[in-house]
């Protein structure tokens, strides 16, 4: 069975669960391919495709798997550093408006920060500034390394939050699904 998924989804969600699937179904040989392209089932040797979206693909059967919230996350070091260095002029990260003094990390294909800031009723933060990444896993790694605050999808940040590699500076989430 060949499964095509987005790279970040493979790294952050699917691969950590693959071992349990293999234990339950040892007779199924699984091949994971990562791609950001739409799959052409007539040409590509793929059995299942998992993509992020609304699931409306003409001529294909699709299932809605789960909702994802957008959640601001950063390194615990960045959050502690902002607090401990405040007396030396470092930017605090106590309120959403404090994001204007921090680097925002972006997914280059989506404008999630603008949506999240609107949902949080926050003005005065430039939602377009900061580096953008072509892959969510790279963006989240930048956040883990203390390079800024990322807006992560809940399914992709779950394990990093549990392991303490990422923290939520704010409890406000946004679900962009219609």
Place the predicted regions along the sequence by residue.
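Central regulatory/effector-binding core of bacterial HTH transcription factors
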Residues: 1-58
């Amino acid at each position: 069975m060949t499964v095509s998924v987005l790279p970040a989804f493979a790294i952050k969600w699917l691969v950590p669960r693959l071992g349990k699937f293999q234990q339950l179904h040892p007779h199924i040989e699984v091949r994971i391919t990562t791609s950001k392209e739409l799959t052409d089932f007539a040409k590509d040797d793929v059995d299942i495709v998992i993509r992020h979206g609304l699931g409306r693909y003409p001529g294909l059967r699709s299932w809605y798997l789960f909702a994802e919230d957008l959640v601001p996350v950063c390194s615990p070091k960045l959050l502690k550093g902002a607090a401990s260095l405040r007396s030396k002029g470092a930017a605090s990260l106590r309120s959403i408006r404090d994001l204007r003094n921090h680097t925002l990390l972006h997914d280059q294909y989506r404008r999630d920060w603008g949506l999240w800031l609107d949902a949080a009723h926050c003005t005065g933060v430039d939602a377009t500034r900061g580096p953008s990444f072509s892959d969510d896993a790279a963006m989240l790694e930048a956040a883990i390394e203390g390079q800024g605050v990322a807006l992560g999808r809940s399914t992709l940040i779950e394990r990093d939050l549990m392991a303490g590699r990422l923290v939520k500076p704010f409890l406000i989430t946004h679900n962009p699904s219609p």
